[in-house]
Amino acid sequence: MDGVVRDILGRQLEAWLTRVVVRGRPSVVALAFGQGALLAAVDSAEAVLGVLAQHADRLRGRQLTVLVLADGNEELPARLGALEATLPAGVAVHLVPGGPARLPVAVKAAGAAGTPLLSYLDGTGATDPAVLAAGAAGRPGELLLVTDTNLPGVTDTDLPSVADTDRPGAASAPVVPASAMPASTGPVPAPPASAVPASAAPGSAPPVPGPPTSDAPASTAPGSVLPGPPARVSGSVQASLVRAGFPLATQVDLVPIDGSSARRLALGTGHDRSLEAFKDILWTVDEDAGIRYRDPTDPAQHLLHIAADPEPGPLCRELLAELARTGPRTVTELRRHALTATPYRSIDVRRALTEMLTSGAATRDPEHGRLGGDVVITVARRP
């Protein structure tokens, strides 16, 4: 399990560096380990510094501060010191006593407010609101966290899509859970007609204004306010990230096949590209890693096998449930729903929609032509 999480962290860091380094702004990477994660602290911090060493050529002439917050681990100074010696002069590594609770003070001392900030949180205190808010203080801010699924406040029964809360006048309708749909891998049936819809180098750089790009932060429509999560999902890690200031968030449970405790992995970001990269990383994890994925919002707790082309049946059921709950949606809206509210990628939606349309479980408008983003998908009603 720890090896899988380290691999995901390292690859997410690589994706983050690709976006941040080219901008030439001072940046901060903060790693915070609480009680229960101290054994993983050394290996995770080493993995991060190893990634930075691999990108040493791109980091030369750049200013990057790495904060490692952990208590009670005597191996850290020696093992990280050896790796720090291989990094470019502009990369500084600082060990800070304490766990996630010290993150707000540490990132402030490092001048991370208003500069690119990537945070990784593991262990006790990782979901504290003040800690998550500190991770959102970067411009941009991105946060990856892992926590036990049995901690108070991380049990979910349903979670609305971000797109749904963005729609003006969207009705608050009961959710039709994915588990209510047939579990068969055959043709997807339509739902019934009755379905209800610390010490670090100071210094920072001000945010750099510029025209919007495809990597621009997600936002609501002009003049609108980013909605907070509804009360019924107030215990969700994903909802906590949204409340902390991350416009985009997603979560997935990592379930070991050996029966050991599952862990919840969540990402908060402001960039579509980062969220897409995270999902791509998830589905390219080694299929023999000994874990399965689970949607925290699925009451039936179905397990998803890792594959380059995941089986579309569970996503079909989830999309049908979303359509039954909210009414007709465009392909673009369904792609966003899959990206934020399920473990799936947005590219998986086309395959699922094709199966839904072919089986007669859903209809499209217009009826013919390319399945573009503006095509409207509707649940097919039985006579």
Task: List PLM regions with ranges.
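C-terminal target-recognition/interaction regions appended to catalytic cores
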Residues: I281-P383
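SAM cofactor-binding core of SAM-dependent methyltransferases
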Residues: D2-A109, R345-E355
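Long, intrinsically disordered low-complexity tandem-repeat segments
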Residues: T155-T220, S224
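Core SAM-dependent methyltransferase catalytic element
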Residues: R264-A277, T284
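Conserved proline-anchored active-site loop of SAM-dependent methyltransferases
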Residues: S27-V42, A112-A130, V146-D148, G268
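Conserved beta-strand signature within the Rossmann-like core of class I S-adenosyl-L-methionine
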Residues: R139-G153
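Short, conserved loop/helix-junction motifs that constitute active-site signature segments
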Residues: R58-L59, A134-P140
